């Protein structure tokens, strides 16, 4: 087995971190809206921004995995 395949598998694991991060952020956003429903628009704005930042780590991991497999 090539070390590139192993490295690509480890790089894809960044998707797990992104999923956990988005899950925690969504839970906290729902909790915040439950406490203050009038602030739901602002909470959702920050949630979407945070989710996008979490998702970039998964995208970078996927790109790195493709680059490592292309060697």
UniProtKB/Swiss-Prot annotation:
Pfam families: ATP-synt_C. The record marks 55 as: Reversibly protonated during proton transport. GO terms for molecular function: lipid binding; proton-transporting ATP synthase activity, rotational mechanism. The chain crosses the membrane at residues 5-25, 46-66. One of its GO terms (cellular component) is proton-transporting ATP synthase complex. InterPro entries: ATP_synth_csu_bac/chlpt (IPR005953), ATP_synth_F0_csu (IPR000454), ATP_synth_F0_csu_DDCD_BS (IPR020537), ATP_synth_F0_csu_sf (IPR038662), ATPase_proteolipid_c-like_dom (IPR002379), F/V-ATP_Csub_sf (IPR035921). The keyword Transport applies. It is a multi-pass membrane protein. Keywords: ATP synthesis, Cell membrane, CF(0), Hydrogen ion transport, Ion transport, Lipid-binding, Membrane, Transmembrane, Transmembrane helix, Transport. It is found in: Cell membrane. F(1)F(0) ATP synthase produces ATP from ADP in the presence of a proton or sodium gradient. F-type ATPases consist of two structural domains, F(1) containing the extramembraneous catalytic core and F(0) containing the membrane proton channel, linked together by a central stalk and a peripheral stalk. During catalysis, ATP synthesis in the catalytic domain of F(1) is coupled via a rotary mechanism of the central stalk subunits to proton translocation. Belongs to the ATPase C chain family. HAMAP family: ATP_synth_c_bact (MF_01396). F-type ATPases have 2 components, F(1) - the catalytic core - and F(0) - the membrane proton channel. F(1) has five subunits: alpha(3), beta(3), gamma(1), delta(1), epsilon(1). F(0) has three main subunits: a(1), b(2) and c(10-14). The alpha and beta chains form an alternating ring which encloses part of the gamma chain. F(1) is attached to F(0) by a central stalk formed by the gamma and epsilon chains, while a peripheral stalk is formed by the delta and b chains. NCBIfam families: ATP_synt_c. This is ATP synthase subunit c. It comes from Clostridium beijerinckii (strain ATCC 51743 / NCIMB 8052) (Clostridium acetobutylicum). The lineage of its organism: Bacteria, Bacillati, Bacillota, Clostridia, Eubacteriales. The gene is atpE.
